[in-house]
Amino acid sequence: MTPLICAADLSVSHGGDLPVLSHVDFLIRPGEIVTVVGPNGSGKSTLVRALLGHVSLSSGRVERVPGLRIGYVPQRVHIERAMPMTVRRFLSLPRRVGDAQAAAALERTGVPGLEGRQITALSGGQFQRVLLARALLGDPQLLVLDEPTQGLDQPGIVAFYKLIEEVRAETRAAVLMVSHDLLVVMRASDRVVCLNGHICCEGTPQAVSAAPAYRALFGSEAQGTLALYQHHHDHDHDHVAEGHRHGPACAHPH
């Protein structure tokens, strides 16, 4: 199956400093949920921006299928509190959508009827669902979520990831997530990539939870994911390898 995005030997440096990312190989296939985890400063958000073409590469390349439709929920969205903006108007940025389409997107993400509310009056959970609704308006083949549950409480986090799984089942879109919510994310993912400037290990959540590199990075929190993980997906990526790489040809036989 042709990957939606494939990166080979990807490295990124900022201003001539030490590389933020070093020789990273990465791919995501249609319909799979892939989560990138790692400590603060490990390059997770930089990897997402590189895959989307938003930052320059020091080396390597990124290939995307032609015409790939991407829905993006960024890590931070700054809304000027002094500038009134309704949910309806927000959904039409950057491109205009009809009333019926906007209403359907809000319904799909569990926040129907919010069109007239001010963005600044929304709760954290409502705002994340509105962001997701906007990302879904373009009927994406790939949904990219960069730390989508920041500021949510634990029930809100669980509910949001349940919604993501429902959206994936309904739309068949692939999902690429960056997250620190290890306990929840592990159970919501088909494949996990553990990043710390380079790929430390990757594979199914169960395998990554037990990997020495993962446990070295996350310590007792890693033990918790291993203990609580209950995942029954039958998926091709059941391997874990230290420094596992997909190779420069963006081909990965299974």
Swiss-Prot record:
The keyword Nucleotide-binding applies. ATP binds at residues 38-45. One of its GO terms (cellular component) is plasma membrane. Residues 5-221 form the ABC transporter domain. Residues 234-254 are annotated as: Disordered. Residues 234-245 have a biased composition (Basic and acidic residues). GO terms for molecular function: ABC-type zinc transporter activity; ATP binding; ATP hydrolysis activity. InterPro entries: AAA+_ATPase, ABC_transporter-like_ATP-bd, ABC_transporter-like_CS, Metal_Ion_Import_ABC, P-loop_NTPase. It is a peripheral membrane protein. Keywords: ATP-binding, Cell inner membrane, Cell membrane, Ion transport, Membrane, Nucleotide-binding, Translocase, Transport, Zinc, Zinc transport. It catalyses: Zn(2+)(out) + ATP(in) + H2O(in) = Zn(2+)(in) + ADP(in) + phosphate(in) + H(+)(in). Its EC number is 7.2.2.20. GO terms for biological process: response to zinc ion. It is found in: Cell inner membrane. It comes from the Bacteria. Its main location: membrane. Belongs to the ABC transporter superfamily. Zinc importer (TC 3.A.1.15.5) family. The complex is composed of two ATP-binding proteins (ZnuC), two transmembrane proteins (ZnuB) and a solute-binding protein (ZnuA). Part of the ABC transporter complex ZnuABC involved in zinc import. Responsible for energy coupling to the transport system. This is Zinc import ATP-binding protein ZnuC.
